């Protein structure tokens, strides 16, 4: 009975700060590719490349549900 109850799927999220904006991607440019520095947790200090949907600026704090996966670099065809 000492089981922890999760109220939100985002309870395990880890904070990261946007340190660089790499470009826009997606069919209509609706996704922004950014470099994020992890602020807490076991990957603290690690820099990841992530795709973020919606408005984002340098210095924004984003909550990442997981820190294992990285986005592929944007490439010109």
Swiss-Prot record:
<keyword id="KW-0687">Ribonucleoprotein</keyword>
<dbReference type="GO" id="GO:0030490">
    <property type="term" value="P:maturation of SSU-rRNA"/>
</dbReference>
<dbReference type="InterPro" id="IPR012340">
    <property type="entry name" value="NA-bd_OB-fold"/>
</dbReference>
<protein>
    <recommendedName>
        <fullName>Small ribosomal subunit protein eS28</fullName>
    </recommendedName>
</protein>
<dbReference type="Pfam" id="PF01200">
    <property type="entry name" value="Ribosomal_S28e"/>
</dbReference>
<dbReference type="GO" id="GO:0003735">
    <property type="term" value="F:structural constituent of ribosome"/>
</dbReference>
<dbReference type="GO" id="GO:0022627">
    <property type="term" value="C:cytosolic small ribosomal subunit"/>
</dbReference>
<comment type="similarity">
    <text>Belongs to the eukaryotic ribosomal protein eS28 family.</text>
</comment>
<dbReference type="InterPro" id="IPR000289">
    <property type="entry name" value="Ribosomal_eS28"/>
</dbReference>
<keyword id="KW-0689">Ribosomal protein</keyword>
<dbReference type="GO" id="GO:0000028">
    <property type="term" value="P:ribosomal small subunit assembly"/>
</dbReference>
<dbReference type="InterPro" id="IPR028626">
    <property type="entry name" value="Ribosomal_eS28_CS"/>
</dbReference>
<dbReference type="GO" id="GO:0006412">
    <property type="term" value="P:translation"/>
</dbReference>
């Amino acid at each position: 009975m000492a089981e922890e109850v999760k109220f939100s799927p985002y309870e395990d999220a880890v904070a990261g700060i946007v340190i660089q904006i790499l470009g826009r991607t997606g069919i209509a440019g609706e996704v922004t590719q950014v470099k994020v520095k992890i602020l807490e947790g076991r990957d603290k200090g690690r820099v990841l490349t992530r795709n973020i949907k919606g408005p984002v600026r340098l210095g924004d704090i984003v909550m990442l549900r997981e820190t294992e996966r990285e986005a592929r670099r944007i490439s010109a065809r």
